[in-house]
């Protein structure tokens, strides 16, 4: 089993890349870090406003699950219900014969989370600020997190970009074995550029 960690700023294309890679490798499984969000009911108003910040994730559970995956080569993992905007326990299964597991999320390459060394290969997905904001704004509108275009854009430029700064300041990009530059979408096609560290 080959373990790949895919990190990057919000809206950079981590999930898109993970799904694309998994579709090319029969039996590959994607484990999204979104499954480790703390449930909305457990967060106060500030937690809901800043949801996606490091402290709004079940960090210890994530690390324990990654350690178990590395050690046992199998496991059951949470997914994320976008309709409920909450984690969904036990919906992703990895078997010993699974050839590749792609773990994607904001903080998979964070130094103090203690998981980046567990991956056989680490990818950081880079993206221009304005392109990421455009994607995030669209995502917030589609998911109902933005009651208007203005509210959705404010969230993307505010809370989401605060999380991006945490990731960049931590040196996640420099910890990657490969940096993929996600270009502007045109007609559903995303341009990728590669820069090996």
What are the roles of these predicted feature ranges?
Residues 8:
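The Walker A (P-loop) glycine that initiates the GxxxxGKT/S ATP-binding motif of P-loop NTPases
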Residues 17:
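Hydrophobic positions on the alpha1 helix immediately C-terminal to the Walker A/P-loop
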Residues 11:
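Walker A (P-loop) phosphate-binding loop of P-loop NTPases
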Residues 85-142:
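ATP-dependent NMP and nucleoside kinases share a basic, alpha-helical "lid"
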Residues 14:
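Conserved lysine of the Walker
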Residues 29, 38-84:
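Conserved nucleotide-sensing/catalytic segment adjacent to the nucleotide-binding pocket
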Residues 141-191:
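Small-molecule kinase domains that catalyze NTP-dependent phosphoryl transfer to phosphate-bearing small molecules
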